[in-house]
């Protein structure tokens, strides 16, 4: 078995600059400084020069990347680990992982016809990285921190072997709360430092009036995830519960919109590393589910057809209950906001107003595709600059 990438990492410390880490990617030394050869030119180009801003480097890099490499940045897919941590969902459909030379990655293609996502045909991990150029994957398994770090390092090593180095962003739902493992909602628990569920955390904050509970919670998450190389979370739920029958109530911070907003005022900078975006030691967040998933019809969830409608039962309830926590997400520059899978119902809702006091047209389109809510409310009036 080949030596794992974790055991082959070389580090170059720049004085008053970043540490450059690599397994096999070329490192350029110039004027006593080290630069990773990201674009493969072998020069301190605008892409490779860490002294420039991220925006300047990205602008230069997009001119170099091929069309296929750019397309690969658009997609996100569930991904799997090697044989030590087989996916129960895929195993139930007959998939048998085949280890790569490190033993960490699954090199067996996936072909399943009966899954929560319908039919799935996925390539080997190497082909996903080197031929499809996919750089965003969701991890649902629950490995030890050591195994997780090894797995992520092995993925990053694969990206180093491409002509143009674009690192892999591995995402996960939250991992630091006690609870039952539920696919797509609470994927992993009991391995990282474990706090009560989010309802319990909110109750503790409300009962003790100690918001520093959130500061410690967020700092723990940031340090643990960053240490493993897990740099993005599909978390946390800013939804305000207005129907206790909702299946996903367990993942929220409860029914008090002011408390939820205060929690997110501390949670986002604590996890991302500050209020001005994600820091190098931070973990980026996807706050969900705009414009609030708590407005359920009969408690049904929009992962299923029966829960497709958001119902605003009283005048102004959108602004009063569901929007406040998302104001905090925008104040503290959450990297991304996830719209919910539902759509608003004008027929079943009381009138709602935007921030200018104008009636909101409740068009029956999914929120991710709803121009009124995404372009008009979230970006236009609330000023969100990240991605949805």
Label each residue range with its predicted role.
Residues 1-388:
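Glycoside hydrolase catalytic-domain context in secreted enzymes
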């Amino acid at each position: 078995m080949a030596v794992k990438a974790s055991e082959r990492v070389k580090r170059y410390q720049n004085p008053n600059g970043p540490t450059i880490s690599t397994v096999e990617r070329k490192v350029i030394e110039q004027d006593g400084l080290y630069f990773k050869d990201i674009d493969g030119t072998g020069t301190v180009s605008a892409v490779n020069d860490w002294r420039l801003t991220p925006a300047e480097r990205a602008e230069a890099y997009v001119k170099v990347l091929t069309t296929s490499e750019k397309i690969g940045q658009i997609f996100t897919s569930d991904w799997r680990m090697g044989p030590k941590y087989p996916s129960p969902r895929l195993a139930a459909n007959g998939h048998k992982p085949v280890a790569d030379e490190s033993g960490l990655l699954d090199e067996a293609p996936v072909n399943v016809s009966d899954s929560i996502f319908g039919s799935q045909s996925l390539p080997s991990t190497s082909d996903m990285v080197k031929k499809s150029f996919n750089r965003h994957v969701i991890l649902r398994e629950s490995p030890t921190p050591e195994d997780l770090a090894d797995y992520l390092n092995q993925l990053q090593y694969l990206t180093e072997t491409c002509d143009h180095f674009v690192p892999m962003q591995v995402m996960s739902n939250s991992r630091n709360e006690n609870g039952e493992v539920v696919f797509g909602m609470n994927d992993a628990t009991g391995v990282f430092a474990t706090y009560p569920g989010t309802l319990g955390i909110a109750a503790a904050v409300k009962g003790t009036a100690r918001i520093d509970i959130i500061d410690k919670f967020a700092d723990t998450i940031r340090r643990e995830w960053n240490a493993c190389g897990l740099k993005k979370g599909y978390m946390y739920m800013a939804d305000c519960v207005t129907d206790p029958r909702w299946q996903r109530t367990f993942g929220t911070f409860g029914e008090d919109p002011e408390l939820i907003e205060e929690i997110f005022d501390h949670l986002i900078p604590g996890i991302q590393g500050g209020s001005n975006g994600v820091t190098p030691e931070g973990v980026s967040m996807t706050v969900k589910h705009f414009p609030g998933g708590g407005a359920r019809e009969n408690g049904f969830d929009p992962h299923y057809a029966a829960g497709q409608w958001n119902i605003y039962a009283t005048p102004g309830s959108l602004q009063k209950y569901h929007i406040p926590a998302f104001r905090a997400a925008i104040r503290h520059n959450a990297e991304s906001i996830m719209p919910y899978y539902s759509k608003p119902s004008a027929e079943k809702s009381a009138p709602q107003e935007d921030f200018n006091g104008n009636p909101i047209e409740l068009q029956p389109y999914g929120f991710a595709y709803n121009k009124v809510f995404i372009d008009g409310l979230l970006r236009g009036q609330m000023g969100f600059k990240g991605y949805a």
